[in-house]
Amino acid sequence: EESWDDYLYWQETDKRIVKKINELIKDTRRTPFEGKGKPEPLKHNLSGFWSRRITEEHRLVYAVTDDSLLIAACRYHY
């Protein structure tokens, strides 16, 4: 739910960020561990999650299962 709130925040404040998030999600669905946004695996309490850069400050944080993509956050730095 937090990630949806993040997404709604961007829809209200910066359409360019929404476009970038959508591009990153599309790319992540195709190639989860390489591509746009400099994908990197997260460590410690976020082990199993990956991040991609939306901007210098904000990250798309996600996990991939066999058949789905879980978006954990798309605002701030994990």
Positions of predicted regions on the chain:
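PIN/NYN-family metal-dependent endoribonuclease catalytic core
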Residues: E1-E2
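Enriched for short, Lys/Arg-rich terminal
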Residues: D5-K19, E23, K36, L42-K43, ...
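Blade/loop signatures of beta-propeller domains
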Residues: R30-T31
